[in-house]
Amino acid sequence: MLAFCYSLPNAGDVIKGRVYEKDYALYIYLFDYPHFEAILAESVKMHMDRYVEYRDKLVGKTVKVKVIRVDYTKGYIDVNYKRMCRHQ
């Protein structure tokens, strides 16, 4: 297990960050975890026309997201915005 494993969020945590686009996927710069970024899982699965609408709505905004998956060995964090919206 790597040293930074203890500084990553757990699945089910709600975290806050700013959305940006990179390589046709939406990522989130995490405010509480400054050395890590998370990927919005639903942005990868979308068709391009729906993705463009989704991107225009979220890029540059500060949002709360729910952590759905964490790979502690690689430092990958997958988050979901839709699940967070349903709970609010």
Swiss-Prot record:
Keywords: Host-virus interaction, Inhibition of host innate immune response by virus, Inhibition of host interferon signaling pathway by virus, Inhibition of host PKR by virus, Interferon antiviral system evasion, RNA-binding, Viral immunoevasion. This is Protein K3. GO terms for cellular component: cytoplasm. Belongs to the poxviridae K3 protein family. The record marks 45 as: Involved in host species specificity. Transmembrane segments: none annotated. The C-terminus is involved in the inhibition of host EIF2AK2/PKR kinase. Residues 8-82 form the S1 motif domain. SMART domains: S1. InterPro entries: K3-like_poxvir (IPR016397), NA-bd_OB-fold (IPR012340), S1_domain (IPR003029). Pfam families: S1 (PF00575). Disulfide bonds: none annotated. Interacts with host EIF2AK2/PKR kinase. SUPFAM superfamilies: Nucleic acid-binding proteins (SSF50249). Residues 43-53, 74-79 are annotated as: Binding to host EIF2AK2/PKR. GO terms for biological process: symbiont-mediated suppression of host innate immune response; symbiont-mediated suppression of host PKR/eIFalpha signaling; symbiont-mediated suppression of host type I interferon-mediated signaling pathway. Viral mimic of EIF2S1/eIF-2alpha that acts as a pseudosubstrate for EIF2AK2/PKR kinase. Inhibits therefore EIF2S1/eIF-2alpha phosphorylation by host EIF2AK2/PKR kinase and prevents protein synthesis shutoff. Determinant of host species specificity. It comes from the Viruses. It comes from Vaccinia virus (strain Western Reserve) (VACV). GO terms for molecular function: peptidase inhibitor activity; protein sequestering activity; protein serine/threonine kinase inhibitor activity; RNA binding.
